[in-house]
């Protein structure tokens, strides 16, 4: 049996479908559905991961102090735990660079 690659357009996306020469329409629609389902689910998971990362970054930057800023109209306090984390990573980076220079 000879297999070909049939290209069709769906929702503005060019999707390749591998199958027999005579593809039935229901097989084409099913493969479109599965490929779109995989695409949309990967976009959803990626969006969730980006949202979690942005939430993490904002929590580290503001340290829940923006709530107090909006409620009591005072400046947010200095970020201590992020500063400690940055100091640790810079020390670790320069320590590894120093060890690499010795060899």
Swiss-Prot record:
Keywords: Membrane, Transmembrane, Transmembrane helix. It is found in: Membrane. It is a single-pass membrane protein. GO terms for cellular component: membrane. Its main location: membrane. The chain crosses the membrane at residues 37-57. It comes from the Eukaryota. Partially overlaps CYM1. This is Putative uncharacterized protein YDR431W.
